[in-house]
Amino acid sequence: MAEITTIARPYAKAAFDFAIEKNAVDSWAEMLNFAAMVSENETMKPLLSGSLASHQLAELFIGVCGEQVNEQGQNLLKVMAENGRLETLPAVSQLFVEMKHEWAKEIEANVVSATELSSEQQQEISVSLEKRLTRKVKLNCSIDASLIAGLIITAGDLVIDGSVRGKVSRLSDSLQS
């Protein structure tokens, strides 16, 4: 995975820089997401690593994408096809979205709780995380009854485990050592 990310990063960075310059970050995110879905299609996957010439592959891929990808997006796809990198489109799209969130000072936080959180609780968590991370936070909430009580928050590299299950696990580990 690290190798794919290394290969995809320059394409994502170039697309992101261009999108910022043209004030089209959202439309580029949509284009790259669509192209990534096309590249993951079961019919398309064998063609990406197949024996088609790069220009034929680019024409085919752009034809499948149709109006969903503009002229500049098509140019990116042609360059990627020439370099045999179309299979990295999902990673390019993911990196682009990460750059978009970083640029917009946004972060997604996953909150797993033992019971459903009220809108007030979600608001409190969101405000606290925004202060701590100095970013706009989008919460993705889910329920896992095995936590017993409390919650686990994951936002980027930050993990806060305030669940009873986590506390019992840490207590068990400390008693065993």
From Swiss-Prot:
Transmembrane stretches, start-end: none
InterPro entries referenced in this protein's UniProt entry, alphabetically: ATP_synth_OSCP/delta_N_sf (IPR026015), ATPase_OSCP/dsu (IPR000711)
Recorded topology in the membrane: Peripheral membrane protein
Keyword hit for Membrane: yes
One annotated Gene Ontology cellular component of this protein: plasma membrane
Domain of life: Bacteria
Key words, A-Z: ATP synthesis, Cell inner membrane, Cell membrane, CF(1), Hydrogen ion transport, Ion transport, Membrane, Transport
GO molecular function: proton-transporting ATP synthase activity, rotational mechanism
Pfam families, per database record: OSCP
UniProt xrefs under Gene3D superfamilies: N-terminal domain of the delta subunit of the F1F0-ATP synthase
Subcellular locations according to the entry: Cell inner membrane
Main location: membrane
Quaternary structure and partners: F-type ATPases have 2 components, F(1) - the catalytic core - and F(0) - the membrane proton channel. F(1) has five subunits: alpha(3), beta(3), gamma(1), delta(1), epsilon(1). F(0) has three main subunits: a(1), b(2) and c(10-14). The alpha and beta chains form an alternating ring which encloses part of the gamma chain. F(1) is attached to F(0) by a central stalk formed by the gamma and epsilon chains, while a peripheral stalk is formed by the delta and b chains.
Matches recorded under NCBIfam families: ATP_synt_delta, PRK05758.2-2, PRK05758.2-5
HAMAP family assigned: ATP_synth_delta_bact
Matching PANTHER family: ATP SYNTHASE DELTA CHAIN (PTHR11910)
Sequence similarity: Belongs to the ATPase delta chain family.
Functional summary from the UniProt entry: F(1)F(0) ATP synthase produces ATP from ADP in the presence of a proton or sodium gradient. F-type ATPases consist of two structural domains, F(1) containing the extramembraneous catalytic core and F(0) containing the membrane proton channel, linked together by a central stalk and a peripheral stalk. During catalysis, ATP synthesis in the catalytic domain of F(1) is coupled via a rotary mechanism of the central stalk subunits to proton translocation. This protein is part of the stalk that links CF(0) to CF(1). It either transmits conformational changes from CF(0) to CF(1) or is implicated in proton conduction.
Protein name (database record): ATP synthase subunit delta
Organism: Shewanella woodyi (strain ATCC 51908 / MS32)
Species lineage: Bacteria, Pseudomonadati, Pseudomonadota, Gammaproteobacteria, Alteromonadales
